[in-house]
């Protein structure tokens, strides 16, 4: 019998903590983004880390579950402490952002059209490739905003970013 999965996420009143791992998949200067179909903003693919799970392995698991392919989880690029409000909840999110390689067979479209969809729990997710430029990412409401101009930065030591929206703490 397998133990139930325990995501590192908890709610206390109107506040929620999440431990998230996400991937920066680049192809032809485009980045893969995703969202729930009902949502207005886009973000990097990934998900919550489970208790006892390394963040890089969590990203690999999420990629297989959502994209149906084995991803090559690379170097840790960013560690972000992100404080924001979303749908009336104050979030404190600890995010680990890794370089992510995807196999060539994973669909690529440079026209901004949806290239992949999947069901994750009760959410219908959609994925697309967009130019990895700050202006384009701002136009689609990419979150976290502090990463918009940094996705094409050359690899180096991981960068620690703290972002606090006005009134989110």
Show the residue positions of the predicted features:
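Short hydrophobic/aromatic beta-strand or adjacent loop that forms the aromatic wall/cage
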Residues: 18-22, 93-97, 124
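Conserved Nudix-box catalytic region and its N-terminal flanking loop in Nudix hydrolases
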Residues: 27-65, 69
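Short, well-ordered beta-strand micro-motif
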Residues: 25, 99-101, 128-131
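Acidic, metal-coordinating catalytic segment for phosphate/diphosphate chemistry
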Residues: 1-22
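Short, charged/polar surface micro-motifs in flexible loops or helix N-caps
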Residues: 29-31, 38-39, 50, 82-83, ...
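A short coil-to-beta-strand element that immediately follows conserved catalytic motifs
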Residues: 70-79
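Nudix hydrolase/Nudix homology domain
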Residues: 40-42, 107-109, 113-169
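Active-site-adjacent beta-strand/loop module that shapes the phosphate/pyrophosphate-binding cleft
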Residues: 84-113, 150-151
